[in-house]
Amino acid sequence: MMKKLLAGVLCWGLLFAAAPAARALTVEPATDRTFDLPCQAAILIDEDSGTVLYEKNADEQRPVASITKVMTLLLTFEAMEEGRIHADDLVPVSEHAYHMGGSQIWLEPGEQMTLDDMLKAICIASANDAAVAVAEYVGGSEPVFVSMMNEKAAALGMTNTHFENACGLDAEGHLSTARDVAVMSREVLLNHPLVKEYCTVWQDSLRGGETQLVNTNKMLKSYTGITGLKTGTTGKAGVCISASAERDGLRLIAVVLG
Protein backbone atom coordinates (compact mmCIF):
# COMPACT_ATOMS: atom_id res chain seq x y z
CA MET A 1 0.00 0.00 0.00
CA MET A 2 2.70 2.49 1.01
CA LYS A 3 4.69 1.73 -2.13
CA LYS A 4 1.67 2.38 -4.37
CA LEU A 5 0.83 5.62 -2.61
CA LEU A 6 4.31 7.03 -2.80
CA ALA A 7 4.85 5.87 -6.35
CA GLY A 8 1.73 7.81 -7.26
CA VAL A 9 3.13 10.99 -5.76
CA LEU A 10 6.46 10.62 -7.49
CA CYS A 11 4.94 9.66 -10.83
CA TRP A 12 2.78 12.75 -10.68
CA GLY A 13 5.77 14.97 -10.01
CA LEU A 14 7.98 13.28 -12.55
CA LEU A 15 5.49 13.93 -15.34
CA PHE A 16 7.28 17.27 -15.64
CA ALA A 17 10.44 15.44 -16.67
CA ALA A 18 8.71 13.72 -19.58
CA ALA A 19 8.42 16.85 -21.73
CA PRO A 20 11.56 19.00 -22.21
CA ALA A 21 9.47 22.15 -22.53
CA ALA A 22 7.70 21.53 -19.25
CA ARG A 23 10.67 22.58 -17.16
CA ALA A 24 10.62 26.02 -18.77
CA LEU A 25 7.04 26.59 -17.64
CA THR A 26 5.77 27.79 -14.31
CA VAL A 27 4.66 24.77 -12.31
CA GLU A 28 1.40 25.24 -10.46
CA PRO A 29 1.53 23.20 -7.26
CA ALA A 30 -1.27 20.73 -6.68
CA THR A 31 -3.68 21.17 -3.79
CA ASP A 32 -5.69 18.78 -1.65
CA ARG A 33 -8.66 19.45 -3.89
CA THR A 34 -6.87 18.59 -7.14
CA PHE A 35 -4.73 15.71 -5.89
CA ASP A 36 -5.24 13.86 -2.63
CA LEU A 37 -3.36 11.00 -1.01
CA PRO A 38 -4.97 8.62 1.50
CA CYS A 39 -2.34 9.29 4.17
CA GLN A 40 -2.02 11.45 7.27
CA ALA A 41 0.56 13.89 5.91
CA ALA A 42 2.67 14.29 2.78
CA ILE A 43 4.84 16.69 0.82
CA LEU A 44 6.58 16.65 -2.56
CA ILE A 45 9.41 19.09 -3.22
CA ASP A 46 11.97 19.85 -5.90
CA GLU A 47 15.30 18.73 -4.43
CA ASP A 48 17.35 21.46 -6.09
CA SER A 49 15.15 24.51 -5.49
CA GLY A 50 13.12 23.36 -2.49
CA THR A 51 9.92 24.38 -4.28
CA VAL A 52 6.86 22.66 -2.82
CA LEU A 53 4.87 20.87 -5.52
CA TYR A 54 2.30 19.20 -3.30
CA GLU A 55 1.49 19.15 0.38
CA LYS A 56 -1.08 17.69 2.71
CA ASN A 57 -1.03 18.44 6.44
CA ALA A 58 2.66 19.14 5.93
CA ASP A 59 3.03 21.00 9.24
CA GLU A 60 1.13 18.50 11.38
CA GLN A 61 3.38 17.06 14.06
CA ARG A 62 3.56 13.28 13.95
CA PRO A 63 5.86 10.43 14.97
CA VAL A 64 8.17 9.66 12.05
CA ALA A 65 9.63 6.29 13.05
CA SER A 66 12.97 5.42 11.42
CA ILE A 67 12.93 8.46 9.15
CA THR A 68 14.52 9.91 12.30
CA LYS A 69 17.70 8.19 11.13
CA VAL A 70 18.04 10.76 8.33
CA MET A 71 19.18 13.23 10.99
CA THR A 72 21.42 10.60 12.58
CA LEU A 73 23.02 10.04 9.19
CA LEU A 74 23.31 13.77 8.51
CA LEU A 75 25.29 14.38 11.70
CA THR A 76 27.43 11.29 11.11
CA PHE A 77 28.36 12.31 7.57
CA GLU A 78 29.18 15.81 8.82
CA ALA A 79 31.53 14.33 11.42
CA MET A 80 33.16 12.16 8.76
CA GLU A 81 33.70 15.05 6.38
CA GLU A 82 35.17 17.14 9.19
CA GLY A 83 37.66 14.34 9.87
CA ARG A 84 36.42 13.66 13.41
CA ILE A 85 35.51 10.08 12.56
CA HIS A 86 36.38 7.74 9.70
CA ALA A 87 34.68 4.91 7.82
CA ASP A 88 37.20 2.34 9.05
CA ASP A 89 36.86 3.33 12.72
CA LEU A 90 35.74 0.53 15.01
CA VAL A 91 32.47 1.49 16.71
CA PRO A 92 31.91 -0.22 20.08
CA VAL A 93 28.53 -1.57 21.13
CA SER A 94 27.21 -0.56 24.54
CA GLU A 95 24.61 -2.28 26.71
CA HIS A 96 22.27 0.57 25.85
CA ALA A 97 22.62 0.05 22.10
CA TYR A 98 22.25 -3.70 22.58
CA HIS A 99 18.86 -3.25 24.25
CA MET A 100 17.26 -1.41 21.32
CA GLY A 101 14.16 -3.15 20.01
CA GLY A 102 12.58 -3.14 16.57
CA SER A 103 14.72 -3.51 13.46
CA GLN A 104 18.25 -4.56 14.39
CA ILE A 105 21.30 -6.56 13.41
CA TRP A 106 21.58 -8.18 16.85
CA LEU A 107 24.69 -6.38 18.02
CA GLU A 108 26.23 -7.77 21.19
CA PRO A 109 27.62 -5.71 24.10
CA GLY A 110 31.34 -5.26 23.61
CA GLU A 111 31.17 -6.13 19.92
CA GLN A 112 32.95 -3.78 17.54
CA MET A 113 32.02 -3.06 13.95
CA THR A 114 33.45 -0.58 11.48
CA LEU A 115 31.57 2.65 11.00
CA ASP A 116 31.18 1.70 7.35
CA ASP A 117 29.37 -1.51 8.31
CA MET A 118 27.26 0.32 10.89
CA LEU A 119 26.17 2.78 8.19
CA LYS A 120 25.23 -0.12 5.93
CA ALA A 121 23.13 -1.57 8.75
CA ILE A 122 21.38 1.76 9.28
CA CYS A 123 20.77 2.64 5.64
CA ILE A 124 19.91 -0.81 4.33
CA ALA A 125 18.31 -2.65 7.25
CA SER A 126 17.25 0.36 9.36
CA ALA A 127 19.00 -1.16 12.37
CA ASN A 128 18.11 0.63 15.60
CA ASP A 129 20.99 -0.89 17.55
CA ALA A 130 23.48 0.31 14.94
CA ALA A 131 21.94 3.80 14.89
CA VAL A 132 22.31 4.15 18.64
CA ALA A 133 25.85 2.74 18.62
CA VAL A 134 26.85 5.30 15.99
CA ALA A 135 25.10 8.07 17.91
CA GLU A 136 27.09 7.17 21.01
CA TYR A 137 30.30 7.07 19.01
CA VAL A 138 29.73 10.48 17.44
CA GLY A 139 28.26 12.25 20.46
CA GLY A 140 29.76 10.34 23.38
CA SER A 141 26.30 9.26 24.53
CA GLU A 142 22.87 9.05 22.97
CA PRO A 143 21.45 11.96 25.05
CA VAL A 144 24.30 14.23 23.93
CA PHE A 145 23.80 13.14 20.33
CA VAL A 146 20.06 13.78 20.58
CA SER A 147 20.86 17.31 21.74
CA MET A 148 23.02 17.67 18.64
CA MET A 149 20.09 16.44 16.53
CA ASN A 150 17.77 19.04 18.01
CA GLU A 151 20.35 21.80 17.58
CA LYS A 152 20.78 20.84 13.92
CA ALA A 153 17.03 20.75 13.43
CA ALA A 154 16.76 24.27 14.83
CA ALA A 155 19.60 25.47 12.59
CA LEU A 156 17.79 24.07 9.55
CA GLY A 157 14.55 25.82 10.51
CA MET A 158 12.76 22.61 11.45
CA THR A 159 10.57 24.44 13.93
CA ASN A 160 8.05 21.63 14.45
CA THR A 161 10.56 18.89 15.17
CA HIS A 162 11.80 17.47 18.46
CA PHE A 163 13.88 14.32 18.78
CA GLU A 164 14.04 12.07 21.84
CA ASN A 165 16.25 9.33 20.42
CA ALA A 166 18.57 8.58 17.51
CA CYS A 167 16.66 5.67 15.96
CA GLY A 168 13.00 6.67 15.80
CA LEU A 169 11.39 4.26 18.23
CA ASP A 170 8.14 5.69 19.60
CA ALA A 171 8.77 8.05 22.51
CA GLU A 172 6.73 10.82 24.11
CA GLY A 173 7.52 14.12 22.40
CA HIS A 174 9.47 12.54 19.53
CA LEU A 175 7.74 14.35 16.67
CA SER A 176 8.33 15.95 13.30
CA THR A 177 6.36 16.98 10.21
CA ALA A 178 6.37 16.11 6.54
CA ARG A 179 7.82 19.53 5.75
CA ASP A 180 10.61 19.24 8.31
CA VAL A 181 11.46 15.72 7.12
CA ALA A 182 11.74 17.08 3.58
CA VAL A 183 14.08 19.82 4.84
CA MET A 184 16.50 17.42 6.54
CA SER A 185 16.27 14.96 3.65
CA ARG A 186 17.16 17.70 1.19
CA GLU A 187 20.07 18.78 3.41
CA VAL A 188 21.68 15.36 3.50
CA LEU A 189 21.05 14.64 -0.20
CA LEU A 190 22.48 17.94 -1.42
CA ASN A 191 25.46 18.20 0.91
CA HIS A 192 26.37 14.59 1.64
CA PRO A 193 25.90 12.62 -1.60
CA LEU A 194 27.64 9.62 -0.02
CA VAL A 195 24.30 8.85 1.62
CA LYS A 196 22.95 7.77 -1.78
CA GLU A 197 25.69 5.16 -2.13
CA TYR A 198 24.56 3.55 1.11
CA CYS A 199 20.80 3.96 0.71
CA THR A 200 20.59 2.55 -2.81
CA VAL A 201 22.26 -0.77 -1.98
CA TRP A 202 19.63 -3.49 -2.29
CA GLN A 203 21.50 -6.30 -0.55
CA ASP A 204 24.73 -6.65 1.42
CA SER A 205 26.13 -8.65 4.30
CA LEU A 206 28.06 -8.17 7.53
CA ARG A 207 30.19 -10.36 9.78
CA GLY A 208 31.78 -12.18 6.87
CA GLY A 209 28.44 -13.05 5.31
CA GLU A 210 26.75 -14.26 8.49
CA THR A 211 24.36 -11.29 8.67
CA GLN A 212 22.35 -10.58 5.55
CA LEU A 213 20.97 -7.11 4.85
CA VAL A 214 18.01 -6.40 2.56
CA ASN A 215 16.92 -2.82 1.96
CA THR A 216 13.66 -1.80 3.61
CA ASN A 217 13.00 0.59 0.71
CA LYS A 218 11.30 -1.76 -1.75
CA MET A 219 10.93 1.09 -4.26
CA LEU A 220 14.55 0.41 -5.21
CA LYS A 221 13.20 -2.60 -7.09
CA SER A 222 9.98 -1.09 -8.40
CA TYR A 223 10.59 2.55 -9.34
CA THR A 224 13.14 3.69 -11.91
CA GLY A 225 15.25 6.59 -10.70
CA ILE A 226 15.00 6.07 -6.94
CA THR A 227 18.04 7.54 -5.15
CA GLY A 228 17.01 6.96 -1.53
CA LEU A 229 16.22 7.57 1.19
CA LYS A 230 14.61 6.14 4.36
CA THR A 231 11.58 4.14 5.40
CA GLY A 232 10.02 3.86 8.84
CA THR A 233 7.24 2.01 10.62
CA THR A 234 6.09 2.00 14.24
CA GLY A 235 2.77 1.54 15.99
CA LYS A 236 2.27 5.26 16.52
CA ALA A 237 3.82 6.53 13.29
CA GLY A 238 2.28 4.01 10.93
CA VAL A 239 4.06 3.45 7.62
CA CYS A 240 6.32 6.33 6.60
CA ILE A 241 8.89 7.10 3.94
CA SER A 242 11.12 9.88 2.71
CA ALA A 243 11.96 8.97 -0.88
CA SER A 244 14.13 10.72 -3.43
CA ALA A 245 14.17 10.16 -7.17
CA GLU A 246 15.75 11.58 -10.31
CA ARG A 247 14.71 11.41 -13.95
CA ASP A 248 16.02 13.48 -16.85
CA GLY A 249 17.74 15.90 -14.49
CA LEU A 250 14.67 16.54 -12.34
CA ARG A 251 15.22 15.55 -8.71
CA LEU A 252 12.33 15.23 -6.28
CA ILE A 253 11.83 14.36 -2.63
CA ALA A 254 8.52 12.86 -1.48
CA VAL A 255 7.57 12.37 2.16
CA VAL A 256 4.54 10.32 3.21
CA LEU A 257 3.66 9.92 6.89
CA GLY A 258 1.06 7.50 8.20
Regions found by a protein language model. Give the residues of each.
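Bacterial N-terminal signal peptides that target proteins for export
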Residues: M1-V9
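A generic structural signal for well-ordered coil/turn residues at beta-strand boundaries
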Residues: L10, P38, A87, V214-N215, ...
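Active-site-adjacent loops and short helices of periplasmic peptidoglycan-processing enzymes
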Residues: A24-R179, L189-L190
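Bacterial N-terminal signal peptides
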Residues: G8-A17
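Hydrophobic alpha-helical segments, especially transmembrane helices
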Residues: K4-L5, A24, V70, R247
